[in-house]
Amino acid sequence: METLASLYNEHLSTLQQRTRDVLERHQLDALLIHSGELQRIFLDDRDYPFKVNAQFKAWVPVTQVPNCWLWVDGVNTPKLWFYSPVDYWHCVEPLPDSFWTKAIDIQPLVNANDIAQLLPVQRERVAYIGYAQQRAQALGFSAENINPKPVLDYLHFYRSYKTDYELACMREAQKTAVAGHNAAHEAFLSGMSEFDINLAYLMATGQRDTDVPYDNIVALNEHSAVLHYTTLQHQPPAEIRSFLIDAGAEYNGYAADLTRTYVAGSKNTADSKNDFAALIKDLNNEQLGLIKTLKCGVNYTEYNVQMHQRIAKLLRTHNLVTGISEEAMVEQGITCPFLPHGLGHPLGLQVHDTAGFMQDDKGAHLSAPSKYPYLRCTRILQPRMVLTIEPGLYFIESLLAPWRSGEFSQHFNWDLIETLKPYGGIRIEDNIVIHENRVENMTRDLKLA
């Protein structure tokens, strides 16, 4: 098995080749990639938690240090100015010494403002990549060379194709996230509150709330019907019926994004609890069934439609919708209030990774179908793409309400829906890798139930 260092060197060669290509295409000499800067809270003397520029951490696994700069030209050894001030107020990161550092020319940057004197004088044909545009202007970058769209389009498009190093990092992120999910499940079974379940997850993964790749969704009962629920109640509800957790982790800047849904057990199990448990089981089977059909050369949008067909089957099988064919359910949009979000999204340096709608390296955009406006990917599946597959089935009153008085109202089993609404909803999410002749399910490979 190749070491992470050798995988990183191959990864760096790939990035260098992409850089040569994009520089030649746009008649540039180099890219100056900024890790970012701390952002001061308005009328305060504190800063918001630092979030690194994704294009920066694509090159080096430095995710917690602002004011770093990377100069790349595709030919010479990438040069990293690493921010290392003399500071007794804050902890200062030492100059890195790790598996990747021999491949990078690392220089200390003691004062953030010194970068102006350290950069090459001639930078008229250099593009700045980062979010501190005022800083770039102060360094003399012209407006057209600050985050030029054609350059970003190119870089974003090829980020969809993960190197072996990136895949190795993402598998490690999966391991951390799975450990957290198992700990959270145990906390749920012991009757803990949402707040305490989240703490159990963070403890098991060794993360703080500011470290996770996205805000953890830890939802009990009807809170599971709020797609991005992040409130975290401090007290458990009087009756715990269900639990949805959507939480991830990072490794060297690469994300995992996993979701599971569970039903609470009890000696006197209500019929509604049995119904909800059966829905979880069957949605899990449909999710796995869809994953088995994934293959190269097919647009992700097609699988989104197929998932709605599978949702229609569940609605009919569980008598949630009756007296209408599965085909008509999909055609008339009856599945949409039950599954209002898309099948999934690209995953990588960002949770909702770039280029989900991009059809080529020049930025051609293909929007989501009007019927499924929240789908986050319209790409044709190709080897080395990493995506989430996360179908759901929810009982959301604001989405169901228009159907109560609509022409198809008689087909909805409103009594059964009312009994299931207190459980909120279901989402099951795995992270998969597209290979030439197979699909790798990184999540199930780690036995996350």
From Swiss-Prot:
It catalyses: Xaa-L-Pro dipeptide + H2O = an L-alpha-amino acid + L-proline. SUPFAM superfamilies: Creatinase/aminopeptidase. Its cofactor is Mn(2+). Mn(2+) 1 binds at residues 257, 345, 390, 429. Keywords: Dipeptidase, Hydrolase, Manganese, Metal-binding, Metalloprotease, Protease. Its EC number is 3.4.13.9. Pfam families: PepQ_N (PF21216), Peptidase_M24 (PF00557). InterPro entries: Creatin/AminoP/Spt16_N, Creatinase/aminopeptidase-like, PepQ_N, Pept_M24, Peptidase_M24B_aminopep-P_CS, X-Pro_dipept-like, X_Pro_dipept. Mn(2+) 2 binds at residues 246, 257, 429. Splits dipeptides with a prolyl residue in the C-terminal position. NCBIfam families: PRK13607.1 (NF010133). Belongs to the peptidase M24B family. Bacterial-type prolidase subfamily. This is Xaa-Pro dipeptidase.
